[in-house]
Amino acid sequence: EYKEGQDNVVLLTLENGKLSGYSTAVGLIESDRVAREAWVTVERERSQRVTLKPGRIKRLIALVSGGDFGGGGAALKELRVTGNRFGLEVFFVRHGFLGLANNWIDAVTEEDTRGMSSHASSPIGSSRFEDFKDEQVQRAAMRSLAPYLEDSALVVLGGDGSLRGARAIHETYGVQVVGIPGTIDNNIAGTTSLGFHSAIALANQSIESLKATSAAMGSIFFVEVMGAGSGHLALACAYQARAEGILVNEHPDPDTYIEDIVLGTLQRTLGVPNKSHIFVVAERTPHRHHREGGVHGLVDYVAQTIATWPQRRGTTGPYSLASATKATILGHTLRGAPPTPEDKMIAQHLAYETVRRLVEQPDTIVGCMVAYHDSNRIETIPLHAVSPKPFDWELFTRMHVAELQHDRV
């Protein structure tokens, strides 16, 4: 017997080439029921805020917010190209939400977007604008948007903080907004973010160069990359480079990792001819050697520790090869990485679908983020449901299994 608050599950069986089935009720536990009801309520509110009707949008406004990233130019150009094909006027806002509050909104022509697809970073500028959390600043932005609100949509390209800003003006003021994920940190669940592949490609060039000099000189390199408190970028860089180890914020005990994996690996391999020693570190990963974490204090500690070790394997004679320990911080170089073909392709897919759905099915995309999956599959995730991406512990473990088996070359 079906009761309110239960799911209805249909079970199918195949007998003599025919499908048969029956329905059964499965009760929800209280926490699941509450979560589902909350989701339904919030989604109903989102759909009620959608004022655009199919075929009624006339103007499109786009901005890039937060930390810059590769691929943004390709997305912006596709928004202009596809928008014009659908008969829309397209406007860009310079320097993100800061520009919106200052009314730095410009109409865009074909000439303005020439060469934009290959532009590193954001060709229309970006900014971190913490003041946008203030209600008065949001009202200033709304005054800038006032002439466009009736028949326009705002597209926000950026990371989790920028998407929170987009959600705020959608829920508070009813702005018809769509988010496109863009961050080298790739820390948004359910999508690949613009800039991630470009950052990895540039990091790979640097790390491969460091591997070559490490193997030649017997040096040890700790390479720090950005991550905004997450290790997705560091893990991808370390895995593709076959680094000896990786320090990330998600690890429950970085100090033990330093002792067991970093120093343990060096004890086994330091002095092996033509062996590189590369460790990738996510910025601000906490450890006991420096209050700022990351590579700070770590390099000195490792250098001081290995200085106490006896002559290492692979060395003969009265003189040993010195193993210099170095820190290399890639930092903001990865934000300005030239966009890779993959990032440009993802950007164009996301931008095209954004415009198409705004024109044809606005109720499915307003108040949402467009998400990219493999095989060019585009989905939408409501802005209220955007969440942090879980760390890939399976890849982390696979990387270290190979290390323990001494498979690295």
Predicted regions and their residues:
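Short, ordered loop/turn segments at secondary-structure junctions
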Residues: E15-G17, S65-D68, V93-L98, R128-F129, ...
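N-terminal phosphate-binding or glycine-rich loops at protein starts, especially the Walker A/P-loop
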Residues: T51-A101
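Short glycine-rich or small-residue beta-strand-to-loop segments that form or flank ligand, phosphate
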Residues: R59-G71, S122-S127, S152-L157, I220-E224, ...
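A glycine- and small-aliphatic-rich helix-loop capping segment at beta-alpha/alpha-beta transitions
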Residues: K77-F86, A107-D112, A168-V178, L194-S198, ...
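Accessory alpha-helical/coil subdomains and C-terminal extensions
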Residues: V90-V93, A153-G158, R164-A168, Y173, ...
